[in-house]
């Protein structure tokens, strides 16, 4: 019963990515029809009664079957690649003429699919991942979610590398790479130690004159917040300070965006550490227009609602949980030695997201769409948006062991970095503008609609990883391809 529950729970629609699931469905057909010699070959019957001869016959056909499967899979990825290119063309036409009403074939098939800022060489990426994961050689396990996720990641890296190789210094190329913190750069709740393998990769990217940003939910305002971020990134910051691989200009290309999009820090050579950047130097116009009283009201109402949920689920004992309220975020965290049930975390993040919809509907100058999104990934973040300039973006998300509500989201965090860096006169605007197609966000929270890192898809190309080890692997690939220029 427990095993069945876990399987069914994991397969809930709100935990799926529709685009990946759709590709999985396409790949299931050739797997069923071509991945087993018995499915299309009758010669096996001659050897069926002799187990040894039958086994030898199957082994003799392994290569042929794998090649057939690979070709079938390649055909599918080639077709999906064309659909992505068509979607990019239609999106560009709509950007030029908003009255253009045609919808791309891909968006008709997968309505929830987001925008693609670069073409995706999926066929090439599939061959790369097939050589690593032996997808075509499998007979009992069909192409999986992680297979498709890895192929999409590799395709994005290949696309950015090709753009980088084809450009000159002032042309369109990869300029900014941002990262989530927990589970992406370091283990959940941990920090970057001096021996972390990802540090070498980050230093190499900085030495290539790329901007590196850490866009994290952890929010510590002001210069007084520097020690907390230093504690999280100590290994990297110490290495940047002392390494001869970087010049002073490159050292200051490290930035940290805290609280999703609320607090900006930058490495400063004089400080030898991070320096807090005042909001008026980097806030986007939409963020500057937000009413502080309205923000306080959102925080106060959410605080009250969290206390209600804390009491409702009997989490209000002093040894169980604590509600922490900051300037632009509020959350409920477990006390040492206690663990909040996964179901309670999901209930709380769903409840908070719905409460936020109500709050924003009451406070917005223009009515907020009250339709709750069809797919809510309660293990991730739920973000609310409206076209109105005064509408405050709010993000409710599950950090894995706690639940937080932040003002802003990572789409604003990444976009703020893009705009802020172009204000720096020392770059003589050679890097400007930093386009969405020239930015890459790497994170672990992309499942379904409204997730924490999911929002970064609005402002940059993305890579979906599942562990710091995967981050190192994808950066190795990226550096290798960029260095081939």
Swiss-Prot record:
Keywords: ATP-binding, Hydrolase, Magnesium, Metal-binding, Nucleotide metabolism, Nucleotide-binding. The keyword Magnesium applies. It is an enzyme of class 3 (hydrolase). InterPro entries: ISN1 (IPR009453). It comes from the Eukaryota. Its cofactor is Mg(2+). IMP binds at residues 180, 182, 188, 216, 402, 410. It holds the Pfam family ISN1. The keyword Flavoprotein does not apply. GO terms for biological process: inosine salvage; nicotinamide riboside biosynthetic process; nicotinic acid riboside biosynthetic process; nucleotide metabolic process. Mg(2+) binds at residues 180, 182, 444. Belongs to the ISN1 family. IMP-specific 5'-nucleotidase involved in IMP (inositol monophosphate) degradation. Homotetramer. This is IMP-specific 5'-nucleotidase 1. It comes from Debaryomyces hansenii (strain ATCC 36239 / CBS 767 / BCRC 21394 / JCM 1990 / NBRC 0083 / IGC 2968). The lineage of its organism: Eukaryota, Fungi, Dikarya, Ascomycota, Saccharomycotina.
């Amino acid at each position: 019963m427990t095993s069945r529950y876990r399987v069914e729970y994991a397969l809930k629609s709100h935990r799926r990515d529709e685009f990946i699931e759709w590709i999985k469905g396409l790949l299931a057909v050739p797997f069923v029809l071509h991945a087993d010699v018995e499915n299309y070959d009758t010669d096996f019957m001659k050897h069926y009664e002799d187990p040894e001869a039958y086994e030898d016959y199957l082994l003799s056909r392994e290569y042929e079957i794998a090649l057939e499967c690979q070709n079938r899979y390649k055909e599918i990825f080639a077709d999906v690649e064309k659909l992505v290119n068509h979607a990019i063309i239609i999106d560009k036409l709509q950007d030029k003429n908003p009255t253009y009403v045609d919808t791309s074939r891909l968006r008709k098939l997968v309505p929830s699919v987001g925008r693609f800022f670069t073409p995706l060489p999926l066929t090439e990426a599939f061959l790369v991942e097939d050589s690593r994961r032996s997808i075509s050689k499998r007979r009992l396990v069909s192409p999986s979610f992680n297979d498709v996720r890895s192929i999409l990641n590799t395709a994005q890296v290949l696309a950015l590398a090709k753009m980088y190789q084809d450009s000159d210094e002032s042309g369109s190329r990869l300029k900014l790479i941002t990262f989530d913190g927990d589970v992406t750069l370091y283990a959940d709740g941990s920090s970057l130690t001096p021996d972390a393998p990802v540090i070498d990769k980050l230093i190499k990217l900085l030495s290539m004159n790329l901007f590196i940003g850490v866009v994290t939910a952890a929010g510590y305002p002001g210069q007084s917040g520097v020690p907390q971020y230093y504690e999280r990134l100590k290994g990297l910051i110490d290495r940047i300070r002392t390494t001869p691989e970087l010049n002073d200009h490159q050292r200051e290309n490290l930035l940290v965006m805290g609280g999703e999009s609320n607090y900006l820090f930058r490495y400063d050579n004089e400080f030898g550490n991070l320096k807090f950047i005042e909001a008026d130097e980097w806030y986007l116009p939409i963020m500057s227009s937000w009413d502080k009283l309205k923000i306080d009201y959102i925080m106060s109402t959410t605080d009250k609602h969290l206390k209600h949920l804390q009491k409702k689920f009997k989490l209000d004992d002093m040894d169980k949980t604590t509600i922490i309220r900051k300037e632009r975020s509020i959350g409920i965290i477990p006390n040492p030695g206690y663990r909040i049930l996964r179901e309670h975390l999901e209930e709380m993040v769903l409840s908070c997201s719905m409460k936020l919809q109500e709050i924003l509907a009451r406070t917005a100058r223009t009515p907020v769409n009250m339709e709750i999104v069809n797919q809510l990934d309660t293990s991730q973040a739920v973000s609310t948006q409206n076209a109105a300039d005064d509408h405050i973006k709010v993000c409710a998300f599950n950090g894995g062991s706690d639940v937080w509500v932040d003002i802003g989201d990572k789409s604003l965090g990444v976009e703020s970095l893009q705009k802020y860096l172009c204000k720096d006169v020392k770059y003589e605007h050679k890097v400007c503008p930093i386009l969405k197609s020239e930015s890459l966000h790497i994170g672990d929270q992309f499942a379904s609609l409204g997730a924490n890192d999911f929002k970064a898809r609005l402002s940059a190309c993305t890579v979906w990883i599942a562990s710091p080890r995967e981050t190192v692997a994808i950066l190795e690939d990226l550096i290798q391809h960029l260095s081939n220029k």
